[in-house]
Amino acid sequence: MEKKILEQLEFEKVKEQFWPYLQTEQGQLELDLLEPIANKDKIQAYFTELEEMAAIFVEHHHFALGGLSDVSESMQRLDLEADLSIQELLEVKKLLQVSAEACRFYADLENVDLVALKALFEKIESFPSLQGSLQAINDAGFVEGFASPELESIRRQISNKEHASRQLLQDILKKQAAYLSESLIASRNGRSVLPVKNTYRHKVAGVVHDMSASGSTVYIEPRALVSLNEELTQLQTDERHEIGRILHELSEQLRPHSRSLRNNAWLLGHLDLVRAKYLYMQAKQAAVPVISDDKSLQLLNARHPLIQNPVANDLHFANDLAVIVITGPNTGGKTIMLKTLGLAQVMAQSGLPILADKGSRVAVFNGIYADIGDEQSIEQSLSTFSSHMTHIVEILKQADSDSLILFDELGAGTDPQEGASLAMAILEQLRLTNIKTMATTHYPELKAYGIETAYVENASMAFDNVSLKPTYRFMQGVPGRSNAFDIARRLGLAEHIVKEAQAMTATNHDVNRIIEQLEQQTLESRKRLEHIKEVEQDNLKFNRAVKKLYNEFSHAKDKELEKAALEAREIVDMALAESESILSQLHEKAELKPHEIIEAKHRLKQLVPEQSLSQNKVLKKAKKWRAPRVGDDIIVTAYGQRGTLLAQLKDKRWEAQVGLIKLTLKEDEFSLVKLKEEAQQPKKRAVKVVKKAATGKGPRARLDLRGKRYEEAMQELDAFIDQALLNNMSQVDIIHGIGTGVIREAVGKYLRRNKHVKSFGYAPQNAGGSGCTIANLG
């Protein structure tokens, strides 16, 4: 493809319009390198990707990938055995996160058939182990203490030393307050110092680090603090060395995967570019064109992408039509129409949507050539005509039957008669070699050429005779006409002068009258066509509205069913609470035995409806997210640290990467990071009472509620107390942990309400403290 045409059509400015919709630097890089191609299959693949992205957005309106930096240089540094900086590791961490999210998104994608994008999604790799390791660096770029035992130890020592240093300074501050200009601890050269009055500088033993501008205050590091600060400085040096070692270790883990990570970045960048194309298409009301099997083109309501509020025009370039000649005066929009065709074709062959209506067709040309604008060369001392002709000669040498040529004001810049003759001769040569060409001209001689010559068609830009302004409407099949007499008359030129001029060009006046009639017929046909299009658009909008209403109705119905189920459950809960009160009163009257009470409660609980709706698509989908999966981010309950699941082991155990450490965890020892966002159904679990060795206080049992959801915990607690009563337990332990306090408070509330609980309180500090509640039954 000739580079010059991309400059003349300002293709770079068109590409800039896609920038706001991009989220990744890799997508930006791919867009920057984007140029027209002549491979029909590849262009069709681009269009298929775009259509599939549109289908994704129908189901997922907010599909996004997240901001990604270009990691290509970082991967090159890894290949050269260099270690990555914290910032580079953060960028790789983000890449791993987005890769994992893309894999999960694709795994959960429903109701969308993908072909082209399927290949992209399935090539994206997830790296849970690497993702877990890089949790050692938080999003602010801080290396966490759990990254290594050594770093944690060093930071603990630093904290202790800093505390001791502050304590010592506070003591000195109190003892020598009389010698200080201010009662505060300052910092100079990274050292903690005291602001001492210069007159008392010898009263405070230590090292002088600075002096105030007035000289009245000296900043002294007390001698007693020097050794502490030196130890602290050494520890800070050790911390930096350990962080460097951790960065090296993380880089070593990434190094074998540099190629895969680079490939992931490209795949995500390409998906981002496809997403940007779709968003541009929606914002600009653009469309994916159909690719013709031949060289025919059909642009429906085509607009120039770089013009504010452009006039939309139709263009039909049949396969057997070789040349379209746009005639008429300047400033009517001929050049804009020429560029509109050129840009539509260039954008389409670059895999971009075009600013035209759905149903538009484009061809695939091996070469697109143009001679547009003023090409005068001062350096070569060439005239405008010579410059244009030099370029035209080069185009004629290169073009063939698989080319598209655009000429603006062909033959201009020389004697009108000679220019018109040259223009006709050039167009005739292109017609004979079957090279699709669109040319603009203001030479009237070319109108006759367009009428008399086969496979050549005239066209023009419409002119409003009332306002004396161009309408920028493209009139295909109608040659341009002169409006000089009408304009002169309306501007006030004497009528006898206008008539005398018309008499001198009587023949041309007749031609203009015929052209005017053709224009009128064309305008009427266009109005009828636009009316038909409006009706079609109204029908399309109606169909979309009906579909939207149906979807909203279905969604509302599901919501109402959920609401009804919740209301029913609330009613049953109230009934259960009331029954609990009644049964308790009966028990106090000794009218029922404990096992009979529990059996009655069980029968009442059977009245509770299932919480979930089996037909509810929303809850069905949420259910899929409930089970842990390899690559999920987790929070380890015991440490409160974040990690990533590596592999599933037996007995519901998982291998997880937390910082640089691998752990084996049970499913109840961690929680999924996004668990709170997911709708889950409570599982029915049998509550097992674990008897402990009898003590002086009688048999005891223990219930562990850590990691349980509120409703699940309350169900298990209720069943547990029932079982304890049946087993004549006098005391039970309920382990709920500290956490957010929600379960702990709920346990207390339940025990206060239960008539069979005599008393309860937190366990001793050595037996769980506020993380465990001991209840006495009776």
UniProtKB/Swiss-Prot annotation:
Binding-site list for ATP: G328, P329, N330, T331, G332, G333, K334, T335
Domain of life assignment: Bacteria
Keywords per UniProt: ATP-binding, DNA-binding, Endonuclease, Hydrolase, Nuclease, Nucleotide-binding, RNA-binding, rRNA-binding
Enzyme Commission number(s) from the entry: 3.1.-.-, 3.6.4.-
Stored Pfam families: MSSS, MutS_V, Smr
Nucleotide-binding listed as a keyword: yes
Domain Smr: 703-778
Gene Ontology MF annotations: ATP binding; ATP hydrolysis activity; ATP-dependent DNA damage sensor activity; endonuclease activity; mismatched DNA binding; ribosomal large subunit binding; rRNA binding
BP GO annotations: mismatch repair; negative regulation of DNA recombination; rescue of stalled ribosome
Keyword Hydrolase: yes
NCBIfam families according to UniProt: mutS2
Role according to the record: Endonuclease that is involved in the suppression of homologous recombination and thus may have a key role in the control of bacterial genetic diversity.
Quaternary structure annotation from Swiss-Prot or TrEMBL: Homodimer. Binds to stalled ribosomes, contacting rRNA.
Protein family according to the UniProt entry: Belongs to the DNA mismatch repair MutS family. MutS2 subfamily.
Annotated protein name in UniProt: Endonuclease MutS2
Species in which this protein is naturally found: Streptococcus equi subsp. zooepidemicus (strain MGCS10565)
